[in-house]
Amino acid sequence: MKGLSGSRSHHHGITCESACDSLSHHSDHKPYLLSPVDHHPADHPYYTQRNSFQAECVGPFSDPLASSTFPRRHYTSQQELKDESALVPRTLATKANRLPTNLLDQFERQLPLSRDGYHTLQYKRTAVEHRSDSPGRIRHLVHSVQKLFTKSHSLEGASKGGVNGGKASPDGSQTVRYGKRSKSKERRSEPKARSNASNASPTSPSWWSSDDNLDGDMCLYHTPSGVMTMGRCPDRSVSQYFMGAYNTISEQAVKASRSNNDVKCSTCANLPVTLDAPLLKKSAWSSTLTVSRAREVYQKASVNMDQAVVKSEACQQERSCQYLQVPQDEWTGYTPRGKDDEIPCRRMRSGSYIKAMGDEDSGDSDTSPKPSPKVAARRESYLKATQPSLTELTTLKISNEHSPKLQIRSHSYLRAVSEVSINRSLDSLDPAGLLTSPKFRSRNESYMRAMSTISQVSEMEVNGQFESVCESVFSELESQAVEALDLPMPGCFRMRSHSYVRAIEKGCSQDDECVSLRSSSPPRTTTTVRTIQSSTGVIKLSSAVEVSSCITTYKKTPPPVPPRTTTKPFISITAQSSTESAQDAYMDGQGQRGDMISQSGLSNSTESLDSMKALTAAIEAANAQIHGPASQHMGSNAAAVTTTTTIATVTTEDRKKDFKKNRCLSIGIQVDDAEESEKMAESKTSSKFQSVGVQVEEEKCFRRFTRSNSVTTAVQADLDFHDNLENSLESIEDNSCPGPMARQFSRDASTSTVSIQGSGNHYHACAADDDFDTDFDPSILPPPDPWIDSITEDPLEAVQRSVCHRDGHWFLKLLQAERDRMEGWCKQMEREERENNLPEDILGKIRTAVGSAQLLMAQKFYQFRELCEENLNPNAHPRPTSQDLAGFWDMLQLSIENISMKFDELHQLKANNWKQMDPLDKKERRAPPPVPKKPAKGPAPLIRERSLESSQRQEARKRLMAAKRAASVRQNSATESAESIEIYIPEAQTRL
């Protein structure tokens, strides 16, 4: 027996005695809680502890067992069992038999804690890796376990006899232990053979191999990180790597490495330096802090966290929360020795354990980490919900360039990510894609940005985060991390909100196609981030955001990166309230002159688009989608502009046709890559959507933006996007299209959230398409009659016009449109005058309207044209600003309204066959046909008419001033919409 113990100690290499000493000291520790300073984790490998227990600490351990509430928590618990069995056999053989039954559970629990390092068990773990998820296999495992238990009982009886013989000696105690161990299923058989071998050669892992397996269990149990990584024993010899990593005993880990060739230094978090590729392979546990497999995965994924740092941190954290934090189920999951190996029946019974067993196969590939049973179970359920497969983690190809930070991040995030619903298999994750693609965006924009800047995050930062995450991961759900790792389906996984969005879009099938495409091409590691935006502003459903990357997000601690400081590869579209959209865009737009597509246009809205890149990509995608193949040939910028509105004028005739087909209050647009856009566009152009859903799939970015109709409608109403787009196209070319157009681009085009014309007054945009070139449809701007109608909407439109397009080009186009329209009216009225024998009063009206229009065009229009030209001339000394132009244009609007009302009246008379209006109208609005009898009445009606016009003008001016004030207020506030909502609404409520 002593030889056996000696061999064991040898096997451990010197650590045994120290372990024994420490064990003896620790025998007093009844709780199995190990503080980081505890000798058990740090000083003793689990197996060394066993040695000490067996040889020297038999008595003390038995005591703690009785006292300890959770014997499994005690290092001594197993010893106690063993000691008890040793003692009991002398006293009562039957009692010994009972002990197995009574203490079997505890013993099982304790075994991992004891960490005798049964390599076989650890190796079994490897075997477990190959186990399939099939219930049959699980059943088989359970059955085998039961057999093993039965067998262990019989063996236990035999061992008891041995124990009786050797009980007095520590060796005897060891022997008893051996019997106990064998009791744990396969351990018995293996330990026996091994014990013999060990007697022959102390260094041989025979006895120890079985112990090591137990140790593997224990180490698994001890090391939450290992558990989190689903520590698979990559190799039987690796079983002890845990001991090193978990115990953080580099020395003992190295010594133990004798039994574990690989374990050598790698097992110790402290010794990560010694990790070799092979070591990593087998003892990747300790080195990567993930299961060796996991670690390999990470290495492949360049997720190789700073091994030393990670290991040390993980070890320390593990030590701090080691044993208690990993549930029994989990450690058993790790330790599954193999189908025949000891897998506590009780644990196996647990569904989570079985699930874990089933899931472990997912980790079979070398690169896939092996989840603990609980982790696996969680992962499984999660997978069922999400279907993403991270099992391809094995193929996870995050380039090393991402640096350990990323690895750490990915590792630490795994759990959070899994919760976030990592869709993407890590393999699909492209480091560049992860960092750069908007998909990588996480729950909230800021977080996404932070994620996008993961590479930017300092390693220190990442490590700190990793530690915190690891703690949370270890304590809360190592399994989730594993889940993230093992998620089986690489395809993008859609959340419920997504389905909602799809329904909204009415593009479900299309969305599915996109999804299938994405899943089929994992390289598009776009986490599908979908934001649903409400009209009140951007309300992101973080739940809607899916991050499909192993490296995705912290669930709890978002990276410290400030939201806007980082590169903003991701598009986050904010639905701006209608009130907000025009003015804030205008403010942004002014600064944004050349950068219509730049994000600044939207910066005001809290959720404004994050990045030009995303915007442009989205714009292109939206462009392709909206315009279909026809628009694709357009320049990406121009296309983006046109895409900004569903009604945006099509730069091509095709687009006009498409728009006419599509005229809807709102359009759901799904934008995909150019390749897909053609197909998608074709189907979408024909379809009408009541709610706006935009799905943008950038190269690797797949997003859906949903705008509430009210928001988009208001926005659309605010801006005649068609004109805006047309002008914006030119302005983009000129790089001088600040104002709402810019915002339009930044928000709508760039976000590829196609703004939808929700409001009826924007029907012009669609209606006038035919009249003008695709580049610009002046008639859309202020339709002749609509101007009269628009008086009610004038404040809004005026504000929007003033706000939206402050560029000289824009105003010139507006001016030209007005001029063309007025000239058309004048020509029509003159023709009517010639062709018809009209009463004098009607002729007078016609002449008045025509004269006023001509005068306005000759004077004010001319002046305004000069102002616009000066605005466009950078050398003009008193160069008017876009605001000046907007103000002057607003003044023109008053005159235009008056004239448009006159022509409107003429049109009504024409519709009435040039007959006077109803008598009431005659009395109110004008004198009856001139009659010499009552010359006095002529002037009175004129006065009344003038008074009506003047009152209307005053009202229009008031509205205009109010609109201007509102616009200025919005300009002054970066969060105009938010403020207006938060401040004004409360006031209204108070009043109510």
From Swiss-Prot:
Subunit architecture: Interacts with guanylate kinase-like domain of DLG1, DLG2, DLG3, DLG4 and AIP1. Interacts with the PDZ domain of SHANK1, SHANK2 and SHANK3. Found in a complex with DLG4 and SHANK1, SHANK2 or SHANK3. Found in a complex with DLG4 and BEGAIN. Interacts with DYL2 and LRFN1. Interacts with MPP2 (via the SH3-Guanylate kinase-like sub-module).
Location of Phosphoserine modifications: 169, 362, 365, 368, 372, 389, 418, 421, 425, 428, 437, 509, 516, 578, 581, 605, 608, 611, 947
GO biological process, one term: aggresome assembly
Membrane topology: Peripheral membrane protein
Modification(s) after translation: Ubiquitinated by TRIM3; leading to proteasomal degradation.
Tissue specificity annotation: Expressed in brain and testis.
Protein name per UniProt: Disks large-associated protein 1
Outcome when changing residue 991 to D: Abolishes interaction with SHANK1
Record's function text: Part of the postsynaptic scaffold in neuronal cells.
Organism: Rattus norvegicus
Phosphothreonine modification, residue list: 579, 606
Lineage, top ranks: Eukaryota, Metazoa, Chordata, Craniata, Vertebrata
